[in-house]
């Protein structure tokens, strides 16, 4: 086994025992990244920074080193990293190198982590297939025949890199499923924490009331380790919660006897593939066998979640993206003689933003306009409150976690949705958006393969601030499923 194939927990133990050096581990990852170029997962490599950090980790070993000392990670291009290109996969931020470090990356580096580079993603995190990136498509390491498959989105580069063992873990962000859907498509673990658990400061904003950063890893234990380093109060983020961060790894007891797992009847979508239905049933059985009580529940406003999300998220995006105007940073269009400032804004935004971003900014501006604010935006906000209330009632009745499918299908081919109605692409988020609208924690766990040999995941949704309990349920599901399959190396 090559060092880059280790889990975070295995590497941590090997480093602590002196069986492995952080420099050797980092070199193994850099070699794998080099060989993994066809996956287009990494878009900005930082080998000098990585090796400097690895050497510092080796020097620190043993003297109260951090929880991630010497662990090489990939960072999604949405996180601002000081002096390193941070473009949110958009041409409008071409060449942008922040003079500051996001809170999440600061915390990871303080814990001893090593940054290998920045990872591909959908432009401004808007997409479910990593096909809206200015860097080109990231490619799923899993393959059927000779078709290249999507790794999902928006955190597609993060998912591909972890699944292909290019790094030991990665950061992702999740606004409507952007950690959980790619994790399911690539056979890895991805958790979106409770809104406010992880600081958003220094992360390029998409929809500020929905965005949340989280870890993408090979195992649930690794997710617990990485989330512990990422989480915590940050005075620089007004939505960051000032509550203690528990020891998530210690919570993985494997004991869920007597816990109540809710199965929402509204998630049985019309036309749901039989494989997804069977996987969901298998998940219920595995949790019941572990001693949990399975309870049918109702979340009556689920059917309104997708339309409400696709009003609220673009509305917030259109406001957040107004700051990209070619004046202070990023791309500025070449102007003709006589062009004024309005021409500069228009040309810069037309050249800098991709089609999907333009579409969402247009939708957002429309639903926030005077004539439609009440008809669309305010109505969507009311629906959001009802969706949150559904979850509150279920948890008040004693449900500990909710089990649902993570995605409506396994990974689809790159380019397959190119001529589809945009709404068809949006349907990929059907099982995940409710979690963001309600601000809850959700995790995707790989549970099996479909008939084509592609990974499928199940989603567990937890009570607010109970990531510890959620991770323990996920750990039990992971152990019962025994998913150890890896993609066959073709790159």
Curated annotation (Swiss-Prot):
It catalyses: L-glutamyl-tRNA(Gln) + L-glutamine + ATP + H2O = L-glutaminyl-tRNA(Gln) + L-glutamate + ADP + phosphate + H(+). The active site is at 76 (charge relay system), 154 (charge relay system), 178 (acyl-ester intermediate). One of its GO terms (biological process) is translation. Allows the formation of correctly charged Gln-tRNA(Gln) through the transamidation of misacylated Glu-tRNA(Gln) in organisms which lack glutaminyl-tRNA synthetase. The reaction takes place in the presence of glutamine and ATP through an activated gamma-phospho-Glu-tRNA(Gln). Keywords: ATP-binding, Ligase, Nucleotide-binding, Protein biosynthesis. GO terms for molecular function: ATP binding; glutaminyl-tRNA synthase (glutamine-hydrolyzing) activity. Belongs to the amidase family. GatA subfamily. Gene3D superfamilies: Amidase signature (AS) domain. The keyword ATP-binding applies. This is Glutamyl-tRNA(Gln) amidotransferase subunit A. Heterotrimer of A, B and C subunits. It comes from Cereibacter sphaeroides (strain ATCC 17025 / ATH 2.4.3). GO terms for cellular component: glutamyl-tRNA(Gln) amidotransferase complex. InterPro entries: Amidase, Amidase_CS, Amidase_dom, AS_sf, GatA. NCBIfam families: gatA (TIGR00132). PANTHER family: GLUTAMYL-TRNA(GLN) AMIDOTRANSFERASE SUBUNIT A (PTHR11895:SF151), TRANSAMIDASE (PTHR11895). SUPFAM superfamilies: Amidase signature (AS) enzymes. Its EC number is 6.3.5.7. It is an enzyme of class 6 (ligase).
């Amino acid at each position: 086994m090559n060092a880059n194939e280790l889990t975070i927990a295995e590497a941590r133990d090997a480093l602590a025992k002196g069986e492995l050096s952080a420099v050797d581990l980092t070199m193994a990852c850099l070699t794998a990244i080099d060989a993994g170029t066809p996956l287009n997962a990494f878009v900005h490599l930082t080998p000098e920074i990585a090796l400097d950090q690895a050497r510092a980790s080796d020097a620190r070993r043993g003297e109260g080193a951090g929880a991630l000392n010497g662990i090489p990670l990939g960072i999604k291009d949405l996180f601002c990293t000081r002096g390193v290109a941070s473009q949110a996969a958009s041409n409008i931020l071409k060449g942008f190198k922040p003079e500051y470090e996001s809170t999440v990356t600061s915390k990871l580096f303080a814990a001893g982590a090593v940054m290998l580079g920045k990872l591909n993603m959908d432009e401004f995190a808007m997409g479910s297939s990593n096909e809206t990136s200015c860097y080109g498509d990231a490619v799923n390491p899993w393959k059927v025949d000779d078709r290249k498959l999507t790794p999902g989105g928006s955190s597609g580069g993060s998912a591909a890199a972890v699944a292909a063992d290019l790094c030991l873990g990665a950061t992702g962000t999740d606004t409507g499923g952007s950690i959980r859907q790619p994790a399911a498509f690539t056979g890895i673990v991805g958790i979106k924490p409770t809104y406010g658990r992880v600081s958003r400061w220094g992360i390029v904003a998409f929809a500020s009331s929905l965005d949340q950063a989280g870890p993408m890893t090979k195992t649930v234990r690794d997710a617990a380790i990485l989330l512990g380093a990422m989480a915590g109060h940050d005075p620089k983020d007004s939505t960051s919660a000032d509550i203690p961060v528990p020891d998530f790894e210690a919570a993985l007891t494997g004991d869920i006897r007597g816990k109540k797992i809710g199965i929402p009847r509204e998630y049985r979508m019309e036309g749901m593939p039989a494989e997804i239905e069977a996987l969901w049933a298998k998940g219920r059985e595995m949790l019941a066998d572990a001693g949990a009580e399975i309870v049918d529940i109702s979340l009556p406003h689920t059917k309104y979640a997708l339309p409400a999300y696709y009003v609220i998220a673009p509305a917030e995006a259109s406001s957040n993206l107004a700051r990209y105007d070619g004046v202070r940073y990023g791309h500025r269009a070449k102007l003709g003689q006589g062009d004024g400032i309005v021409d500069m804004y228009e040309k810069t935004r037309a050249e800098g933003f991709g089609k999907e971003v333009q579409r969402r900014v247009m939708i957002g501006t429309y639903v926030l306009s005077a004539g439609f604010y009440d008809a669309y935006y305010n109505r969507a906000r009311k629906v959001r409150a009802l969706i949150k209330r559904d979850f509150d009632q279920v948890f008040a009745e004693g449900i500990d976690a909710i089990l649902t499918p993570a995605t409506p299908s396994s990974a689809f081919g790159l380019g397959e949705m190119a001529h589809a109605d945009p709404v068809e692409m949006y349907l990929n988020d059907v099982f995940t958006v409710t979690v963001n609208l309600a601000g809850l924690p959700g995790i995707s766990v790989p549970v099996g393969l479909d008939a084509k040999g592609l990974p499928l995941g199940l989603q567990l949704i937890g009570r607010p601030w109970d990531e510890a309990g959620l991770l323990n349920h996920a750990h039990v599901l992971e152990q019962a499923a025994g998913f150890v399959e890896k993609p066959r190396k073709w790159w």
